[in-house]
Amino acid sequence: MIAFKPLAPFGVETFDIDLSKGLAAADFVELERAFYANQVLALRAQHIDAAQFIDFARRLGPPQPHVIDQFHHPTDPNILILSNVKDAAGRPTGLQDAGSYFHTDYSYLAVPARATTLYSRIVPKVGGDTLFANQIAAYDDLPAAMKARIEPLRAIHHYGNRNDVDEASRTAASVLNDAQKAKMPVITHRIARPHPVTGRKALYAVSGSSFGIVGMPDDEARDLLDELATHATQPRYQLRFRYGVGDIVVWDNAALLHSATLIDPADARTLWRVTVLEVEPGAAAPEVLAPTYAAPVR
């Protein structure tokens, strides 16, 4: 049995797994159950290479390379390097700002992200935490009238942040070159979206990539999305995750919003990231993912 310690107000961590020694099938089942029950799963103090990291991530789902390809890992394009470290020539070695605003990874794709994994390689002296906001709890707390209002609605998503008012105001992570933009379609997702594994409804990506609502005037749609985002990111729904060197954190994109936090530019930080996609809609979930996740692991 793997020992899990609760984070607060959701999420769990464990020191019982050493990915450098491989991961038994039974242990993976335990980890996956803890992941779906608690939305955030941290594997502390890992010492693995890029191949071992991607092997673990593939257990969670099919990896999808990030559209910003200039910061792919040199040995595997499925790993995105997040870093403020520069090389000897002064060139960036990674993507410095991966989203210091609440958002959902890959919500701009037709088949969005199941999970994101971050592996902390260099930790800053101060800050660099990740904030998570529980969108299942946020949906549950909505008034009945608001739940009824949003039930039939689909939000319009594309790459970026709706609070970037123009190209000049965008963060580095939000500005794509023409070839990268061509890969990014405009798609829609339900605002009140059932979780693809547990079936629990959550507010889905109401902050970040949601720019409008199908069939609704722009101003009205923006007001509704902003109202939902303000509700969904209240401190009572948030977890602040603090990294140690070698920590791996995995989070459930169907259930959470998340945000990076800024650090002193002089303080070095590097992480590796792999994001894996959900099972295609309509595909049967593996038997081990039958609804056994209603109660958190505590």
Regions from the language model: what does each represent?
Residues 2-248, 254-298:
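Non-heme Fe(II) oxygenase catalytic core, chiefly the N-lobe of the double-stranded beta-helix
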